[in-house]
Amino acid sequence: MLITVLDVGGTHVRWARWSPEQGLGDVRRTSSPSTFRQPGVSVDESRAVLVRMMAEVVPAGAVAGVSFGAALDHRTRAVYASAPLWGVDSRPFDLVAALRGARPDVRWHVVNDVTAALLHLASTQRARGLRKVWLATISTGVACRVIDQRTGEIPVDGCGLQGEIGHLPATVAVDGLPLDLRCDCGRQGHVAAYASGPGIRRLGEVLRHRRGPVWVASDLAQELARGEPFEVALTRAVRSGDTVAVELLAAAAKPIADIVRTSLCLDPELDLVAFTGGVALGLGEHYLAAVLAHLDRDGLYLTSERKPDWIRDRMAVTEVSGLVGAGIAALSEELT
């Protein structure tokens, strides 16, 4: 079965054709319509543009699998909110109904983007034979999912949600002074306010003001002055050992390390703890090292002292495809 797969994120909409036999075809992409890109456009208008965009790329009579970057109810597929796409607006949106209304000839299947990425990771050789797999995406937003490989289950709560860690409260300090940064959802002090791509840029502004001439002389500031995008500048500066960039990454990694610590403390069956998304992949092993540095300093009671490799050996930065995961989810639903 050939499936049209789409991945809707806060930055891009991507689409391709996929099948288990042929794999993923050529991927095309365009900019995501959002209230951040078009501040004068209402959320309803932005949603309508997005639905039209998605509907136009699917062939007649096709099956479509969608990886969607939003908190959504995995029982009903109702979309609750997407801070990167629609900011503070949290009115439920029946995306599946809107897509079916635009293209009733298509069989639509929608899952959350982190769920899709996790389904792809769970299908790989690396994840086979494991008990549970934990995956967090660190990108325009931050979220996490856990799958029990023995049953294939991704449990959800009373709202059909799991792992919306980006909107948990977090504590981050610079020079010993706690910061209270604003998340894209409108609330203060969330994990994503510090650890997402936009959050790291906000932290960068704090350091720019706090460090003054040290910031100006830093590799990070020099890269930015040459017109490099922030993510590229940060990655280059971290790789060069720039102290300001390393400090910035350490601050951004702390809320994620806090969540990993708690996750492993409560569930030792997590055999793989993985990170993906633009931020984590761009920084690669440097991102993992920043998280592990926090866990080395403040780890699991007794375990970190007596079995220090127990945490390190199960952690990785890995590239997975929400497009492939959307295809896997759609195929599974088609066959049931």
Language model features by range: what are they?
Residues 12, 263-298:
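Glycine-rich phosphate-binding loops at beta-strand->alpha-helix junctions
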